[in-house]
Amino acid sequence: MLDTIELSKKLISFDSVTPAKQDIFDFLIKVFEENGFTTKQLNFDGDGSYEVINIMATYGPTNTNGKHFNFLCHVDVVPPGNLEDWDTHPFEPTIKDGYLYGRGSEDMKGCTAASMVSVFKFIKENKDFNGTISFIITGDEEADSINGVKKVVRWLKENNIRIDGSIATESSSEKIIGDQIKVGRKGA
């Protein structure tokens, strides 16, 4: 069984400044498929923006009477800026004084890893689960946010894929937890 900290560290080790590159998605696809998910890579471009890689990983049939619950995540990060300003390298995950440091440790690679590990554990412990769980992971939340979630939602509609509920485990907010609902928000 995967460990949240170890998966977070692996995700942090990918330099995935917006738009996130293929290597982190290849890794995610492998992890999802090893845990019984089917995956679909969704690349979108146009509308005056760059090409963005997105994936949808799905567990369970989509044509049952069960509900379809989704986790909405992103693995792109803002540029780290001047590397000399960092105490540790942004893409070399480091645990110091009980904290995990590295670009994306909070927004949102750590949250993505925690969601994945939790769902994998749920599936393992609930073999009779009658429903569908999916992850939509985009590579463009921290910048334009044009060829990520917006186009994935359009693709879902075009393919008659209905999601009954979704949660973005994004940990950022303006003043209090839950005060922001947006398609994209630049962090750091």
For the regions a language model picked out, list residue spans one by one.
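Short secondary-structure boundary segments
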Residues: 4-28, 109-112, 163, 167-180
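Fold-level recognition of mixed alpha/beta catalytic cores in primary-metabolism enzymes, strongest
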Residues: 100, 110-117, 123-188
